[in-house]
Amino acid sequence: ILAAHDCLPTTSKDDAALILSADIDFLGVNYYVPRRVKARESEYDLDYFTPEYYFENAVNPQGRFNPYRDNNEILPQAIYDIAANIRDNYGNIKWYLAEIGIAMDRQSEGEPGADGVIDDTFRIQLMEEHLVQLHRAIADGANCFGVHQWTFIDNWSWINAFKRRYGFWRLDLETGERQIKRNALWFAELATSNGFTSDK
């Protein structure tokens, strides 16, 4: 497909041989939201190639959506599906969740409570749901060895600048002040105890 659209880099036979002979130590997987697709119903109108040349986005009308991030779909089951795909179709290589995060806007996170902590319980609940699915996948043989939740502090994004927040700590863009979120305390306990109790 890439060759058909003139998107492959120029390589020598030696380059190709080196790439083909190399082993992967482990794979890093970034996951935020599922992406559903359907066959194109309209003409592709860009003058350069993107994968959307072959499909359009599709929305599941019965889906569950994040009210704090552009109504992106929430589908914890997708973590299990990713793990099963790597296990069943890619030799069950070692991998880890290099990025997973739950976006909220500044207003949705609210202000710190009396204890000085920003209460982002919504984020914790969703992370728990996703990690339950990852635990289930590991129990079913997936070779996942770790999770890196995005991210330490609210940061700039290529897509949303500072519109969406992911951090364990809030960053005040005017003053540089940092305020801890409840999610940070939860994740610290999770990392220390290597688990949590869930009824999910």
Q: What is the meaning of each model-derived region?
A:
Residues I1-K200:
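Non-catalytic scaffold segments within catalytic domains of secreted glycoside hydrolases
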